Structure formats: C-alpha cells, structure tokens
Amino acid sequence: MSTSLVSKPLASKAVVVFSGGQDSTTCLIQALTQYDEVHGITFDYGQRHREEIEVAKSLAKRLKITSHKVMDVTLLNELAISALTRDAIPVSHELMENGLPNTFVPGRNILFLTLAGIYAYQLGAEAIITGVCETDFSGYPDCRNDFVKAMESALVQGMDKQLKIITPLMWLNKAQTWALADKYQQLDLVRHHTLTCYNGVIGDGCGDCPACHLRKRGLDEYMQDKTAVMASLDASEPKA
C-alpha cells in the first residue's frame, strides 16, 4: 500500500463580470455548470440604474455563487460623461455625432476587464466571463470581439499569466440568449428578476429605452418559435 499523498486536482475557477442584467446573469448561470468556483464581480460606477447593484447582490445569493464582490469605481463617473452616468442627460434613441449611442460609457469595459483580470489573478482563476455581444448590441465599440481579444492579450502579457476572457454570448442574438437561459431552466428567473432597463425597472423594464426594446424583441422571437431558436442555439455551440 502506497503511503504517498494523492494531490487533489485544482478547482476550476472563473470570475464573472456581473451587472445583474439579462446577459451577465445568463453567463453566470452557465458558468455554474462549468466551473467548481464562480466568483462574481459587480462595479459601482455611479450608474443611472443603480438598482442593478442590489439586483446583482440578490441574484448572487439566490444562485449561491462562491463569492460576490462589489467594487467602487465611481471615479469612472467623474471622467466619463454619458446618459448612464448623468441623470440630467436623457437616454436618446438617436446616435450622437460620433455614431455612438449616448449611453456609451467610454472606457467602461476596459476598466471592468482590467479589474476583473486583477481579481482573477489573485483568486487563481483561469477565466473571466463577460456577457458582451457583437450580434445584437447597442453599437458599443467595447463589446466587439476584436476589443475582447486585445484585452485578453494585454492581461496575459501584463500579468504573465494564462487567462482567458470568455464571451458566451458574442455571436448569439437576443432570442438565442433567451434560449440559453431556458436551456438551464432559468428563463423565468432571468425574465423577472434581472435588470436590463436603462431607467431602472426590474424584469420586463420600462418598455421604452433601447435596452428594453432589444430585450423584448428577442424574447418575442424566442417565444414565437422556441424549437427553431433552440435548434439555432445548439447549432452555434462549438463541438467538442
């Protein structure tokens, strides 16, 4: 009989950038099936829809994730002028002169992914998961795949650590994102207990802001033909 110690395999760990909205909650739900430890990180940047922080706290407890950190990054609010950081600026359906929505917060995802990378480094996590998407998105340049790949390269080189930024929703449309939540039997939770609305209305939202329009259009498409949308989701998933 051997007396040597058998080393226990290291636990797989992921850090999820978690706002409490539809996309990040869906990513969190999926991560819970794929990693031994799932750590959520939520950023308080003085956002217009501050209710999302409390929503994120509630969902983190409900889903029983390993840990949940809320980080104060209100300096971003001082630097970045946007409809999401200034109550006096109404959310517009029109693009600004630079071709971007006035809800774009410059540097937000650069800062979020940098801080999530530092947190992942300290935890010994191998992955950062974020719900950015290039298929159905609001025109934000920091939601593009090229940006994410550049950030991943910067983090790996800057910290000399193998670290992946995983974007499960990057090539999904909103209907497929709803299907993904349903695949894990969490469609009702995502629909009724997340906050995507720019005006801070939980669940189906205000129905008027761009975020609500995008969310509702995707839900309607999914509910009209669940079988077809689920099949398209399955077809989009990478094969082992």
Swiss-Prot record:
InterPro entries: QueC, Rossmann-like_a/b/a_fold. Pathway: Purine metabolism; 7-cyano-7-deazaguanine biosynthesis. GO terms for molecular function: ATP binding; ligase activity, forming carbon-nitrogen bonds; zinc ion binding. SUPFAM superfamilies: Adenine nucleotide alpha hydrolases-like. It catalyses: 7-carboxy-7-deazaguanine + NH4(+) + ATP = 7-cyano-7-deazaguanine + ADP + phosphate + H2O + H(+). Its EC number is 6.3.4.20. ATP binds at residues 18-28. Binds 1 zinc ion per subunit. One of its GO terms (biological process) is queuosine biosynthetic process. Pfam families: QueC (PF06508). Keywords: ATP-binding, Ligase, Metal-binding, Nucleotide-binding, Queuosine biosynthesis, Zinc. Zn(2+) binds at residues 197, 206, 209, 212. Its cofactor is Zn(2+). Catalyzes the ATP-dependent conversion of 7-carboxy-7-deazaguanine (CDG) to 7-cyano-7-deazaguanine (preQ(0)). Belongs to the QueC family. This is 7-cyano-7-deazaguanine synthase.
